[in-house]
Amino acid sequence: MDSLQTAQMVSLSAELGSNNLELAEPEEPGTSAAAGQSAAHPEEVTPEGSQALGAQEPEQSLPLAVPTPLECKVLLTQADALASEGHLREALEVYRQLSERQQLVAEQLEQLVRCLADSVPQEELASDSSGTSSCCAAALKEAGEAAAVAPEVWDGFKCKKCHGFLSDPVSLWCGHTFCKLCLERGRAADRRCALCGVKLSALMAASGRARGPRRAGQPAPLQLRVNVVLSGLLGKLFPGPARASQLRHEGNRLFREHQVEAALLKYNEAVRLAPNDHLLYSNRSQIYFTLESHEDALHDAEIACKLRPMGFKAHFRKAQALATLGKVKEALKEFLYCVSLDGKNKSARSEAQRENLELPHCSNQEGAAAAEESSSLANSAQGKVSSKEDRKKDQEGEDRDAASVRTGKCQEKKRNRCQIETQEDTELPNKVSKQDFPAEQGAKPDLSNPLGSFDASDLECSLCMRLFYEPVTTPCGHTFCLKCLERCLDHNAKCPLCKDVLLQCLPSRKYSKNVILEELIATFLPEEFKERKRLYEEEMEELSNLNKNVPIFVCTMAYPTVPCPLHIFEPCYRLMIRRCIETGTRQFGMCLGDPVKGFVEYGCILEIRNVQFFSDGRSVVDSIGKRRFKVLHQGQRDGYNTADIEYIEDQKVQGDDCAELMGLHNCVYEQASSWFHSLKASLKNRILNHFGPMPEKDEDPQVNPNGPAWCWWTLAVLPLESRAQLPFLAMRSLKDRLNGIRRILAFISRNQN
């Protein structure tokens, strides 16, 4: 909306003869005033007046004309524009004028609710979101005393979907862990990881767990297995919260089956076992609300907000209870909190709009106080920086049935109970910060105390018998070190413990580390983790040495600059290739086999360019020759050969010898090129497909320490046995190598003729 349109609408609203009121100025910091009264403008409030915003009424006002739909539409557009631009105080005045001309509906206040919610500072949500009313003091005290002696649960042991204690933890192939029942809720096709957003069907298919009979067009049933290590550890460290989490899921099931009283009993027992769990209080509040015990529902919602100030559902259920009890102002504020936490939630927006409409239906005194509360929100909004931080979306993933909003029932009871309050309307009591509860009843529990009952032996890999390093949980629920699991899969595509088939894990070779276990070890076993990491880094450093213990592939002849595709199927070479990639060298040696020594004395270093894995664990490696070497000492490591080596290079010549070498180089190149072009077309195509085209002639044949590339290409395609080619690899004289190639080409040409 441009300035001209705004000016026209302001002018039009003035012509309507409305009873314009000025909003009270915000209080100066440090001043205090009675409810509905400003210290700077005490004359702005008249006890018997009907001014909703506490402003002074003009002495004379024109009689209101019958508004037309166009006039009301202009006023609504003007109010929405002011609210969108951040001028909430002016927008509230225009909304009030509009309410005097027509009966507002909830949908017309959507923009106002959105802007009011945006004006709620994040600091207020964190520290001012769970006020302690007198009716809830006893419940807070009781919960605080119980929570003060309860063990504090590490945040890593909480499900990131329901934000409660992990119950039957299932670790997905992406590395994230959730409650089993949380993953099983909802339509199978829509289930996703709450952290990375990957569909569960894709994760299960990648891990081979989505199996079983199914109808045409239906997704495969998900087979979720509990993480054995994590489940046992949670049961050992936190037996109370673990049992409470099970009771919570049982209570949710009973609630869905409309056995509300039985569900309440389950939750009462769960709260006794885990008084620190905000989710228990939040869900029990919903149960109380269903049983029409609204005071108890408010009690539990207050405690849930206290334990988790940024929890959406706790605030929503608190607002739900307040609205039913007729506390319109407090309910509106809580609904605004909800919209601020999750602006996309339609229920929260519609309830906030409806509560805004309910303000005029209450007493004049309450309406004035509520309007002043909205005005204070507007003042705080205008003092904020325009580029506010992104809101943190905090939707607990509990069952939608347990979180359903009985809107009509709530509104009906609220209207019946909305009455004039005789006492003076004061501000809500100051809300205590999160650290005051439950610590106000005693010292906050030490996180290390419950976790001190386990040691590194609880987190040992069953394969290497050492502390987990880069732990990976298989779809069958067992956990191993990443390197240990990969080595086992080289030999057999089954879980080392339960023998469950893990065939689908092989093609991608992408393993995600278990986030919870990795953070747990790094946080609570720092010294053991540091030592384990040191051992791993020493192993990697040793494997990356390209002079000592260099991995040797005993197979065929390889030459510098010449491609060498390999088919890898033996377990020892699977491990060797993977280590070459992991260390970053991507290099290994290639030697011919020897019946006496194991492999010959000379070979060539190959560099891995690409690897393609197959579903059965085999792979095709695209490699190319780099440098020649001589074996000094042979050895073995984990089933494959190794060697200490030294690299060899051609000896350079100068002067007349260099000129003679240049002439010989050009002559042999022309001879090799003529021989290649004389071959049959089918044979030439096979050579080109396997080795590529013949390299160009070098201007300086000695620029490369291994000699010209075309020499090695020619040796690779010549019809010679590997044993006959080996001496060329060991030669350190380019002249001798060129003379040898010339003699072979001459011999082949004579035989062809």
From Swiss-Prot:
<dbReference type="InterPro" id="IPR013083">
    <property type="entry name" value="Znf_RING/FYVE/PHD"/>
</dbReference>
<feature type="repeat" description="TPR 2">
    <location>
        <begin position="244"/>
        <end position="277"/>
    </location>
</feature>
<dbReference type="Pfam" id="PF02190">
    <property type="entry name" value="LON_substr_bdg"/>
</dbReference>
<dbReference type="InterPro" id="IPR046336">
    <property type="entry name" value="Lon_prtase_N_sf"/>
</dbReference>
<protein>
    <recommendedName>
        <fullName>LON peptidase N-terminal domain and RING finger protein 3</fullName>
    </recommendedName>
</protein>
<dbReference type="GO" id="GO:0005737">
    <property type="term" value="C:cytoplasm"/>
</dbReference>
<dbReference type="InterPro" id="IPR019734">
    <property type="entry name" value="TPR_rpt"/>
</dbReference>
<feature type="repeat" description="TPR 4">
    <location>
        <begin position="313"/>
        <end position="345"/>
    </location>
</feature>
<keyword id="KW-0863">Zinc-finger</keyword>
<feature type="repeat" description="TPR 3">
    <location>
        <begin position="279"/>
        <end position="311"/>
    </location>
</feature>
<dbReference type="Pfam" id="PF00097">
    <property type="entry name" value="zf-C3HC4"/>
</dbReference>
<dbReference type="InterPro" id="IPR015947">
    <property type="entry name" value="PUA-like_sf"/>
</dbReference>
<keyword id="KW-0802">TPR repeat</keyword>
<keyword id="KW-0677">Repeat</keyword>
<dbReference type="InterPro" id="IPR003111">
    <property type="entry name" value="Lon_prtase_N"/>
</dbReference>
<feature type="region of interest" description="Disordered">
    <location>
        <begin position="17"/>
        <end position="57"/>
    </location>
</feature>
<feature type="zinc finger region" description="RING-type 2">
    <location>
        <begin position="461"/>
        <end position="499"/>
    </location>
</feature>
<dbReference type="GO" id="GO:0008270">
    <property type="term" value="F:zinc ion binding"/>
</dbReference>
<dbReference type="InterPro" id="IPR011990">
    <property type="entry name" value="TPR-like_helical_dom_sf"/>
</dbReference>
<feature type="zinc finger region" description="RING-type 1">
    <location>
        <begin position="159"/>
        <end position="197"/>
    </location>
</feature>
<keyword id="KW-0479">Metal-binding</keyword>
<keyword id="KW-0862">Zinc</keyword>
<feature type="compositionally biased region" description="Basic and acidic residues">
    <location>
        <begin position="386"/>
        <end position="413"/>
    </location>
</feature>
<feature type="repeat" description="TPR 1">
    <location>
        <begin position="72"/>
        <end position="105"/>
    </location>
</feature>
<feature type="compositionally biased region" description="Low complexity">
    <location>
        <begin position="363"/>
        <end position="382"/>
    </location>
</feature>
<dbReference type="InterPro" id="IPR001841">
    <property type="entry name" value="Znf_RING"/>
</dbReference>
<dbReference type="InterPro" id="IPR017907">
    <property type="entry name" value="Znf_RING_CS"/>
</dbReference>
<dbReference type="Pfam" id="PF13923">
    <property type="entry name" value="zf-C3HC4_2"/>
</dbReference>
<feature type="region of interest" description="Disordered">
    <location>
        <begin position="351"/>
        <end position="450"/>
    </location>
</feature>
<dbReference type="InterPro" id="IPR018957">
    <property type="entry name" value="Znf_C3HC4_RING-type"/>
</dbReference>
<feature type="domain" description="Lon N-terminal">
    <location>
        <begin position="540"/>
        <end position="749"/>
    </location>
</feature>
